[in-house]
Regions:
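Carboxylate-rich, polar loop motifs that coordinate divalent cations or form catalytic acidic clusters
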Residues: 1-224
Length: 224
């Protein structure tokens, strides 16, 4: 009898090929198909056949099918499902990558816990800081012991979930604050459930909220 290789799952991701990816705590990355499941665990840094850290915080799959894995202290890992191999990046080696999204076709935007937001170049593996509004707001938001959750909600807009809900317009390079903790929602850094069309759903572990990008409105749709 074969049992599931992990007890605690932190993230789930269903890719376009209907494969389920489970990011576990201390048991690595688990790929699940209708017929089998395979797991990948940590290996020495730079090894092609495993993760740089066995706790997974986040995923993103790009248009080429590459899965970008955010680990808890081992930075960003690139996983090629076709070859079954990984690539680790020295510039992100010790980062705790809480959330990760596409920024441009060649770049990713990620949040490193208690360190800040960074843009990662997929080809060079180098990173550079991304400032949330200005230095004061960036430090208040990103270096305070809380997570910042990120979601690409349209082709040109990114949502940041923290003590405020920020919307970044990639064309104008301007931010809007559309909600604030203690007013529109109760707890810090609501988890982003999903984006469906113009609507993005979030949970602060008590209530469920909705941001409508077509109207620019934020509201609570379920009170727990």
């Amino acid at each position: 009898v074969h049992s599931f290789p992990a007890n605690t799952i932190y993230r789930l991701y269903l890719d376009p090929a209907n494969n389920m990816w489970a990011g576990s705590i201390r048991r690595g990355l688990i790929g699940i198909k209708n017929v089998y499941a395979c797991s990948y665990q940590n290996v020495p840094f730079g090894n092609l056949y495993g993760l740089s850290n066995q706790t997974i915080n986040s995923f993103f799959q790009d248009s080429d099918g590459i899965v970008w894995v955010g680990t808890d202290g081992g930075g960003i890992n690139r996983f090629d499902p076709v070859s079954g191999t990984f690539k680790h990046y020295p510039a992100t080696k010790y980062e705790k990558v809480v959330s990760i999204v596409e920024y441009t076709p060649d770049e990713l935007l990620f949040f490193s816990f208690n360190k800040g937001l960074f843009i990662f170049h997929k080809k060079t593996g180098q990173i550079r800081p991304f400032v949330l509004i200005d230095k004061e707001m960036n430090d208040q938001t990103c270096i305070n012991g809380f997570s910042v959750n990120i979601q690409r909600i349209t082709k040109t807009k990114i949502l940041f979930s923290a003590q405020h809900i920020f919307i970044y317009d990639m064309v104008t390079r301007k931010f809007d604050i559309v909600a604030t903790m203690g007013e529109e929602y109760e707890r810090h850094s609501p988890l982003i459930i999903a984006t469906k069309g113009a609507k993005t759903y979030l949970s602060d572990l008590k209530n469920i909220c909705e941001y409508d990008s077509s109207e620019g409105t934020f509201r609570t749709i379920y009170q727990g």
